[in-house]
C-alpha cells in the first residue's frame, strides 16, 4: 500500500505549516521515525534521511539555544530530498530557520498539538499498519464476541451463508471472499477487506448484499485482529475429527501462526452456533479455562479411583 504525506496528515490530524501539493503527495517508505539528537551537533554518520523527522520539546529546546546561523546550517544539512516530512509536536513555536530550510529543500513541515510520545505512537501505529506487506486469502473474516475469526473452506461449502447467519446473531462482518491479512508485529495478525468488497456479502441464489445497509453500522467492522481460523469441510463417514479439542493445529499467515479448528459440515448442523462456541471456548482457553483439561483430569481421577478400589 502506498502511503503519502497527505494521508498521514489526514489520519493523524496534523497541521500543515508549509507544503505544496507535490510535497504532500510524496511517498513515505518506512514506518521508522527519527528524533534528531547527534545530528543537531553536526554529526550525520548513519543519519537516515528517508525517515520522518520528529521534533519534540528536547529537540526544540536545543535548537532555541543555538545561534540563528548554526540553527539554519544544521537544519539545512538535516533536511534532505529523501525526507518525506518534518513534524513538530506540542504546538511549539517553529523557528523561521526551520521554515526557510524546509522551503529551500522541498520538505513538508507539519505540526501537532499532542505530546511527542503520543504523536510518535499514533504515527507509528498508522504507518506500521499501512506499510505492512499484505497477503490475500480466501474466506470470511468475522468479529465474534470481540474475537477475529477467519472462516475458510472449499468453494460452495457455505462460508458466506454462515457469515450472514452470524451477522443475524449480532456479530460483525469484516470481510467476505477476499481477506487481506498482514502482520503488525511478529505475533499479531490483522485482516481487512478489499476496498471494492467492503461491507458486501455474496450469497448464492440471492446475489451481493450490502450488510451495512440491511443490518446497520453495528453489523460491520473495517478491520480486526485475526486470532482464530475455522476450516469448514464436508463430513465424511469414517473420517476422524477432533472430538476432545486437544488438537494443536496451527496455520501461518504473513509469518504469524494462529490456531485452526476443523469443523465438519453436514445437513442439519447449525454451523454458526458451533463457530460461536469455538470462539468462546478459544477465549476461555486464553483465560486459563480449559474444558478438555478438566475432562482429562476428571477421567484420570476416575481411573485412579477405580484402580484403588479393585
From Swiss-Prot:
It catalyses: [HPr protein]-L-serine + ATP = [HPr protein]-O-phospho-L-serine + ADP + H(+); [HPr protein]-O-phospho-L-serine + phosphate + H(+) = [HPr protein]-L-serine + diphosphate. Mg(2+) binds at residues 160, 202. GO terms for biological process: regulation of carbohydrate metabolic process. Its cofactor is Mg(2+). Keywords: ATP-binding, Carbohydrate metabolism, Kinase, Magnesium, Metal-binding, Multifunctional enzyme, Nucleotide-binding, Serine/threonine-protein kinase, Transferase. Signal peptide: none annotated. InterPro entries: HPr(Ser)_kin/Pase (IPR003755), Hpr_kin/Pase_C (IPR011104), Hpr_kin/Pase_Hpr_N (IPR011126), P-loop_NTPase (IPR027417), Ser_kin/Pase_Hpr-like_N_sf (IPR028979). It is an enzyme of class 2 (transferase). ATP binds at residues 153-160. The active site is at residues 138, 159, 177, 243. One of its GO terms (molecular function) is protein serine/threonine/tyrosine kinase activity. Residues 201-210 are annotated as: Important for the catalytic mechanism of both phosphorylation and dephosphorylation. Both phosphorylation and phosphorolysis are carried out by the same active site and suggest a common mechanism for both reactions. The Walker A ATP-binding motif also binds Pi and PPi. Homohexamer. Belongs to the HPrK/P family. This is HPr kinase/phosphorylase. The gene is hprK.
